Amino acid sequence: GCLSLLLHYADKLPLALPVCFAGLLLMEWIYCGVRRFQGVGVELLAFFLVTIGLFVAASAVPSSLYKQFAAVLLGLAMFCVLSLILRDVELTMKLRYVIGALAVGLLVLNLFIGETRGGGKNWINLGFITIQPSEFVKVAFIFAGCATLERLMTYRNTILFVLFSGACIGPLFLMKDFGTAAIFFMGMLIIAYMRSGDWKTIAFFSGLAVAGAAVIIAFMPYVASRFATYRHAWEYAASSGYQQTRTMVAIGSGGLFGVGGGNGNLDMVAAADTDLVFGFVSEEWGLLIALCCAGCLILFALYAVRCASRARSAYFAIAACAAAGMFLFQAALNIFGSTDLLPLTGVTFPLVSNGGSSMAANFAMLAFIRAVGLENTGPPAAGKGQVPLLSLIHI
């Protein structure tokens, strides 16, 4: 991948390309060296995805490479700090209300001072940088939400969790960031079901979500147009189905091995390196590499479930499965939305799509999956109980 980019930019090689990729390689070796290459499976998968993400940035917007690499460094730092915090479940319990309040406060602040881009008011411009708060709130949502239900699925804790979830999802609806709201809702379902095992509760929440979606489609024309295009992208190839049809053409033209970095045409389509990144990777580096990216997220989920059934604390089990489930759901929305198998929602592909907020926050979320690893497995600690959903799982 890097070689194909070097060949593409042979006459006008951006300095950012060798600097950022050399820095990425050095970062990976230092991290693995400090860890003595022990138990770094999750991180190696993440490094693969991050590398593909930098390939995408280098091909689509070379000027964004420094920013994207800085986001990788920030994400790794957040991953390490969060991993240290998660070693102490009691500390996590003490921090849950503070983290939860900060998350809700950030979303409310976004409602008042946020900028509208792509139809959603989900950006805050700090002058020197623009951030997407909802990406970082995903980390806080898992941190505080899982801590709320870690000890007991009592009526009080359930009410607190539902109120917290509503306080996070509600502002996202007001911002018209429905794709991210759907990801939060999936996380809420995973957390609630893993702790209770109650299908009736899940069915009730799902029914409310369907009713809410129907209202949104009925009263928001641009959302309705996306659903009208769904499964009919070729009929609207010159209008609302343009992005989906161009993505499918790109996947077909790239074949299994791609046309080479920088040689694709999808970059001329809006959001090619973010919402349509699966097609972008497929065209330039091949469908095999794109499927490997999806496979990494599946491996995260398998790792989370395998370790969760032996976790010392229910918190580790719930948080890991929630993070992995949100990753998978987000990737499914990205892949299937851009290929007209689902309505296009405009969400990124974790760790691959171009964007600093998405990169840093998703890297931080990996800490929840890493925390359920072998050092936190064994017989359940006294008073911690088991997770109902996982009590029958043995992989």
Residues covered by each model-derived region:
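Generic N-terminal amphipathic/basic segments
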Residues: 1-2, 13
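A juxtamembrane structural motif centered on a specific transmembrane helix
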Residues: 2-4, 334-393
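Glycine/serine-rich anion-binding loops at beta->alpha junctions
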Residues: 128-137, 174-176, 255, 259, ...
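Long extracytoplasmic/lumenal interhelical loops at the membrane interface
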Residues: 251-288, 308
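Transmembrane helix boundary and interhelical junction motifs in multipass membrane proteins
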Residues: 177-182, 257-262, 272-274, 291, ...
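Hydrophobic alpha-helical transmembrane segments of multi-pass inner membrane proteins, especially
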Residues: 10-240, 279-340, 364, 368, ...
